[in-house]
Amino acid sequence: MKKIAAILLCLVVVQLSKAQERVITTGVPFLLVAGDARSAGMADNGVATSTDAYSQQWNPAKYSFSLDKQGFALSYTPYLVELVNDISLGQVNYFNKINDRGAFASSLRFFSLGEIELRESFDAQPNVVKPAEFALDLSYSQKLSERFSMAVAGRYIRSNLRIPSEGQSAAAASSFAFDVAGFYQSEETAFTDFDGRWRAGFNFQNLGPKINYDQST
């Protein structure tokens, strides 16, 4: 029994070592930051909630079930306020139902990392840079039945985070991605003390090529 436990322990250590060699660094993580108060207050839960103007980030398929013909939303989110005071996420959303079953939507997210001072030496004149990223989205959702809808979204991403240094360029990186989403909403049901609905959803997000900051490859 001790030999088996020792062998299993060795296998776990080997797997952990290999995992450390394959560290994956996710690019443009600002896409995962909640841009609306409701979803942020619900632990980033927005895929299967009721429709609102911010559905573009979480599940654009929800727009087909909107009771409003169109909607507009604007938000500003300070980020890491306990550490710095100039990092923020701004977001603009708009959707328009073209009929009872289909809807177009678009959004713009802008993430600013504030001002960063670069110095060659302690007494040198600082070089102030303002790294930032943005994403522009466009989606279309369509009801496939009275209770289920799907959506596709395209996204252009531009990231200007690379800080210039001697002998290296600091060009912005850009890429594109797309989402495939679905949403189900039941009929209103009478429960013991209230009327409610069942909702479910999925969203495969940011499918596409890797973003590359190295312009030499």
Regions found by a protein language model. Name each.
Residues 4-13:
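Sec-dependent N-terminal signal peptides
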Residues 20-217:
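Subset of outer-membrane beta-barrel
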Residues 15-19:
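Sec/Tat signal peptide C-region and signal peptidase I cleavage site
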Residues 1-4, 146:
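Positively charged n-region of N-terminal signal peptides that target proteins for export
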